[in-house]
Amino acid sequence: MSGEPGQTSVAPPPEEVEPGSGVRIVVEYCEPCGFEATYLELASAVKEQYPGIEIESRLGGTGAFEIEINGQLVFSKLENGGFPYEKDLIEAIRRASNGETLEKITNSRPPCVIL
């Protein structure tokens, strides 16, 4: 510091760093299967919780709904047969933003409900 008034710079407090910033999500889904609505619903819930997060969508193969966080596959509909619960994805994002180890989401909700 030079001692002159107005010459100091202060980093923003940690709580001002936008939650989820630095976390990148890629969702690959089957558009002909009608999974776009599920992607949009999930992306909206994630953005509500983590406004600074980067979410990218890609068209995938038949039956696909795959989610990567920072390049790591954390959910696969092809493996689980259903869709992830929002709370499980939000928890995985929280872990990623804190630098914690990510685990695969194995809990899933059924792809459809017959009334």
Curated annotation (Swiss-Prot):
Among the GO biological process terms of this entry, one is:
positive regulation of cell migration
The biased composition feature labelled Polar residues covers: 1-10
UniProt-annotated stretches for the region Disordered:
1-21
In the record, which residues receive a covalent lipid, type S-geranylgeranyl cysteine?
C112
Q: What is this protein called?
A: Migration and invasion enhancer 1
Q: Could you describe the post-translational modifications of this protein? A: Isoprenylation facilitates association with the plasma membrane and enhances the migratory phenotype of cells by inducing increased filopodia formation.
Membrane-topology descriptor: Lipid-anchor
Q: Which UniProt keywords apply?
A: Acetylation, Apoptosis, Cell membrane, Cytoplasm, Disulfide bond, Lipoprotein, Membrane, Prenylation, Redox-active center
**Disulfide partners:** C30-C33
Q: Which organism's genome codes for this protein? A: Homo sapiens (Human)
